[in-house]
């Protein structure tokens, strides 16, 4: 109500960190409940932030949206297999730092599989900047709908979430220009991305 222009409010549906204790079938009611609460609250769209959840979890979250009548965006994370060089559906907090990684399947495969059930926007999220442009290219090659990107801004040290190797607004804008040139229509930021970096993205409208 206080905005000077029309805006849309997105409702974020999170994944689960310790789902293995319960099995995929136990998670569906949680997704259903999150979505119901957000829809009843009046959000304009739902964004499923599945991060690096196993493909079965991504599918379960997506199926929970089939009966709603507002737009749905789906976000997944991408990581690079250091042995093969392939982009994978998974997560790695930093390529340069020894942060560990989690891989499931080829990034191109999960995007292709998702596209068979989901025609709405698909985005790469919570990923190292160094893999984001490649992920956008694979999104473009495997999804006919809108694509986008909102990666992390740098590496964070546990347990304090102290961010290091932070990117400057100017450099973040330059990275985003690459995503847009490769087909991204939605751009933003995930962990470590603050107002200054988001503000820099506004310049994309003038280029």
Regions found by a protein language model. Name each.
Residues 1-207:
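Domain-level signal for soluble alpha/beta catalytic cores
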């Amino acid at each position: 109500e206080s905005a000077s222009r029309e805006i849309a409010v997105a409702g974020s549906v999170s994944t689960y960190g310790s789902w293995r204790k319960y099995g995929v079938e136990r998670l569906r009611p949680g997704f259903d409940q999150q979505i119901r609460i957000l829809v009843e609250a009046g959000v304009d769209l739902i964004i499923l932030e599945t991060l690096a959840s196993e493909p079965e979890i991504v599918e379960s979250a997506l199926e929970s949206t089939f009966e709603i009548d507002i737009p749905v965006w789906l976000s997944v994370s991408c990581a690079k297999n250091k042995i093969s060089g392939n982009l994978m559906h998974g997560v790695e907090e930093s390529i340069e730092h020894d942060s560990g990684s989690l891989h499931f399947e080829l990034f191109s495969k999960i995007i292709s599989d998702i596209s068979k059930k989901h025609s709405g926007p698909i985005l790469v999220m919570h990923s190292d900047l160094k893999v984001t442009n490649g992920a956008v290219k694979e999104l473009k090659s495997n999804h006919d709908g809108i694509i986008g990107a909102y990666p992390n801004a740098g590496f964070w040290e546990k347990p304090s979430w102290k961010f290091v190797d932070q990117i400057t607004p100017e450099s973040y804008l330059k990275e985003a220009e690459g995503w847009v040139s490769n087909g991204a229509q939605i751009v933003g930021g995930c962990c470590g991305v603050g107002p200054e970096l988001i503000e820099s993205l506004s310049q994309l409208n003038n280029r």
